[in-house]
């Protein structure tokens, strides 16, 4: 953990530069010092079927979720959320200037015992 997941409408695939966004997000998460680098993952789910608002325009959206393990303070979660949303808005600013685009972001804290993981990548970062 953490996992950064972007749900994106297909009509912005060419312009969204999600590899660039993921690079920035992973760097920012590592820089906080509160997440183990070996657990950071970013991925996209492209949506080929959606409807927004009245459906009359070529609207687009990106909804992003950061899933994190339990145990971090509200203050640290708030700081991470604000920093990431600033980064997200900056990344998508050029696209937002040229089309209708909705951005949303949430942090989801997983249950402390009802999630299960195995990862040997952590050893590379110790």
Predicted regions and their residues:
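Short alpha-helical functional segments enriched in proximate histidine and acidic residues
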Residues: 28, 32-33, 87, 91
């Amino acid at each position: 953990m953490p996992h950064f997941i972007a749900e994106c409408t297909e009509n912005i695939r060419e312009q969204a530069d999600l590899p660039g966004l993921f690079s920035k997000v992973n760097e920012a998460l590592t820089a906080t010092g509160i997440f183990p680098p070996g657990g950071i993952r970013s991925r996209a789910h492209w949506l080929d079927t959606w409807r927004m608002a009245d459906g009359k325009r070529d609207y687009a959206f990106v909804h992003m979720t950061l899933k994190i393990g339990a145990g971090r303070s509200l203050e640290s979660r708030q700081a991470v959320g604000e920093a990431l949303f600033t980064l997200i808005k900056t990344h998508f600013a050029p696209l937002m200037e040229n089309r209708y685009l909705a951005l949303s972001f949430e942090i989801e804290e997983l249950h402390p015992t009802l999630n299960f993981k195995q990862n040997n990548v952590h050893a590379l970062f110790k």
